[in-house]
Amino acid sequence: DLVPGEKVHAYKNVSMNEQFFQGHFPGEPVMPGVLIVEALAQAGGLLLLNSEDKAEEKLVFFTGIDKVRFRDPVVPGDQLHLKIELLKYKMRMCKLKGVAYVKDKKVAEAQMMASVVDKDRGNNG
């Protein structure tokens, strides 16, 4: 579900085959929170690029995260439902709200800031 300039919904199936489960934690596998935030950020990048004209000429750089909260563990067999909302987009600076759910239960949330730049600027800067 993608509405350019507004929102995106994305999904991540969490499998026991994920490399990170080997050490996080042995016998008690839990998806690292930083990877849940990464999934939110990637979905946010998808939303931002699909909101741009000539997206193939753009890059998204995440510049910060705020108000990160982890509410429940994510374990093998879960499906993350990622909901991203574009809160603000002004002069190439963006603010997004991301919430991750498992079976309609909120497991994590974050506000993310990003900048959308031209590829040639991104490579020189």
What does each model-found stretch correspond to?
Residues 1, 8-13, 66, 111-116, ...:
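Small/polar/charged residue-enriched interaction surfaces, especially the RNA/DNA-contacting tracks
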Residues 44-81, 107-109, 114-115:
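Hydrophobic beta-strand-centered segment that forms part of the acyl-chain substrate-binding groove
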Residues 24-55:
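Helix-adjacent hinge/juxtasegments
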Residues 75-78, 85-125:
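HotDog/MaoC-like acyl-thioester-processing domains
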Residues 12, 83-86:
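Short, hydrophobic/aromatic-enriched beta-strand segments in well-ordered soluble domains
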Residues 1-31, 36:
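Catalytic strand-loop segment that frames the active site of acyl-thioester-processing enzymes
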